[in-house]
Amino acid sequence: MGKIKKLDKNVVSRIAAGEAVAGPFSVVKELVENALDASATKIEIEILNGGKSYIKVKDNGEGMSRDDLLLSIEEHTTSKIEDFEDIYNLYSFGFRGEALSSISKVSKLVITSNDGKESNRLEVIGGKIKDIKEYPTSEKGTIVEVYDLFFNVPARRKFLKSDNVEKRYVVEYVEKFLLGNPDVEIVLKSDGEVVYNAVKGNLEDRFRLIFPEVREFTEVSGKYVKGIISSPSYYRNNRTGQIFFVQKRFVIDKMLYYIFETGYGEALLKHPYGVLFIEVPPRFVDVNVHPQKLEVKFSNPNVIYSDITRTVREGIKKFVSKKIFVKKEQNTVNENKLNYAYGPKSKPFQTNIEKNMLFNVEKKQLEVKRDIVVLKKRYVLFESNDGIYIMDFHAAHERILYDNIIKQLDEKVERLDLMIPIEIKIGKSFLQIAEGRKEDFKRFGFNIKIDKEKIIVLSIPSFIKPSDVVEVLMEILDEYRILGENPKSMKHIIADKACKKAVKTGYDILESEAKQLVEEVLKRGLTTCPHGRPLFLKITYKELDSFFERT
């Protein structure tokens, strides 16, 4: 008998449903998009335990008849298309006819719907209909309730995140939905508490709601694109503040991120905020290139990209004309001993990198044989017993400061109580992250309170300047949003961002300071900066002899 067997249809359907339904947030996404396709103007969402135990989406849309209700949970049943070519003339969100069918197979599903003529209630468990009956309701529309997601697929349920993280995923999706549909009233509740209660408005209202930290922005409009962009002086350390919609559908497209930032030109500092809507005739875009419809393909992308760049460039003229300056640090170094209590502003930390990529500088104390020479206010040259070394002064100073801060964070952190608390107004998804990480913040010297719409900072690590607190906290929250749960990352972000007194390239460096730094680096056996770049260029005497053809 052969080893290959045909899977049972029930097994196949549960596997397929598990692929289509990634987690609570994707259930919410599918149900909300169904509500929009039903012309809903008000949508209410409620979740319990991050959506793992209960999800409810209620809308005031067109509703469904008894026959449509029964068809809605069957595979590939839809009201949006009849043949394949209809995909290229779509204005709706759904079209594959798989959302409710997939959800019903991995949950206990209850749908109550009123189409204005009749009202019915359907109960489905694990894809099998348990009951359908008349169920009088006074309001036209549909209520979908999802209980015990993945109850019959334990392997999938096991891989769901914590309640707090799953809730955040739902909140982040709802924030995108709020931005993409300002003309729809939406309420989001989690474990009985109201997260969002957004009335109908315009894009500016929603932008302020989701990105309260951005105080300077403008509306832009081109041939195919319109939306809101921030001043270059408001930015994040990643692209989580950049949201794109194509035909009102949220998409993730690396090229769109790149083109958007290209429009900022020389005004670009890091990653500015932007919410852009791209509208083209349906036949010019393919929305069927990604399982979750998060990617699209344009038939003539260069036309779209040019319009985005041109539109953004016109928009930022309003800000550039205001002469946005980046504050420059003093171009001097304290003539006293180098301050090793502060650290660098640099890229995210890379762990466990101790190998010099250019030369194998052994981790041992070297003997500096002669005077130290400073080259071009940038490098330090010295001779040792086995050759000539050239050290990057800034990178070396940065490494020492970084290591000192990490050591403090591993031990007891000295706190500075703020006489005037610092208030940081941020979006709900960031508040959600902060709420779940209060103990981590406390461990590393921050005492914070979470309000309904802001973080209140009461104390900070003593080595962080109060003027840097907002930037440090926002970067920590950004990293958690992207990388997930990793307390170690908080430690390295704090060390990386907390201190900005590493001597920069081009600053005047006294020979006494250079000597002090070289001795400290050699004493510690350091070979790389915090990000893995080499500190030294080593040229052995043997290599010199070979170069000059001396034998």
Curated annotation (Swiss-Prot):
Query: From the record, what ranges are coiled-coil?
Result: none
A Pfam match is MutL_C
The UniProt keyword set, sorted, is: DNA damage, DNA repair
What Gene Ontology molecular-function terms does this entry list? ATP binding; ATP hydrolysis activity; ATP-dependent DNA damage sensor activity; mismatched DNA binding
InterPro entries assigned to the protein according to its UniProt record, in alphabetical order: DNA_mismatch_repair_CS (IPR014762), DNA_mismatch_repair_MutL (IPR020667), DNA_mismatch_S5_2-like (IPR013507), HATPase_C_sf (IPR036890), MutL/Mlh/PMS (IPR002099), MutL/Mlh/Pms-like (IPR038973), MutL_C (IPR014790), MutL_C_dimsub (IPR042120)
Single GO cellular component annotation?
mismatch repair complex
Q: Please list the disulfide bridges.
A: none
GO annotation, biological process: mismatch repair
Entry annotated with the keyword DNA damage:
yes
* Functional note: This protein is involved in the repair of mismatches in DNA. It is required for dam-dependent methyl-directed DNA mismatch repair. May act as a 'molecular matchmaker', a protein that promotes the formation of a stable complex between two or more DNA-binding proteins in an ATP-dependent manner without itself being part of a final effector complex.
Q: Which family does it belong to?
A: Belongs to the DNA mismatch repair MutL/HexB family.
- Xref: HAMAP family: DNA_mis_repair
Q: What is this protein called?
A: DNA mismatch repair protein MutL
State the species of origin.
Answer: Thermosipho melanesiensis (strain DSM 12029 / CIP 104789 / BI429)
